[in-house]
Amino acid sequence: MDKIDSLDKINAFVSDIRSLRKGYLTNFFLDRKKHSLWIEKGELFYVSFPDCYFLLHLTNSVNNLFFITTTSQQLAENLKAFLPIFAEQMVVDIVGDAKIVDLKDVFVEQGFSVYEQLYRMNRIGTLEFKEIDTPNVCFAEDVDAQVVLDMLHSYFDPLSEQLPSYEEILYFLSLIHI
């Protein structure tokens, strides 16, 4: 297992897999700010196999597993080889429509269990939004970052939600988004 030291390394993994022209399958979607923070903190690692890269985001609370590969068959073969290398608890997020059932089965067959199944919904049409002037409500500041983090961990499950880190919260605060 090797540490990822730049976003360019991740882009090279994507290019490697796409250049094979055998298909492209991933659960990793690049977020430049978030993933740069993971790299700076030394939390992002990879293991490479033929036709497949596994990326691991390792933290004190949750280990997230991501993959970049060609097909679900290739994923299954390489997952069998990968699991003995990293025997700690891992969380895998799989996002998609009904077609991902086969992908879910790849992980279940290797001993993973479904922890949470979420459904995303959208609304057609515009949502009426009324801005209400509330004098006692204001945007959070840097000194509030730990409280925001504590609230997120109190009300959301870190195993089923990818909660932001303290550094990500500071970034959102700087944008006046909280």
Put a short name on every predicted segment.
Residues 163-170:
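A cross-taxonomic marker for long C-terminal extensions/tails that follow the last structured domain
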Residues 70-133:
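Acyl-donor-binding surface of acyltransferase catalytic domains
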Residues 1-31, 118, 130-162:
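Short amphipathic alpha-helix that is part of the acyltransferase structural core
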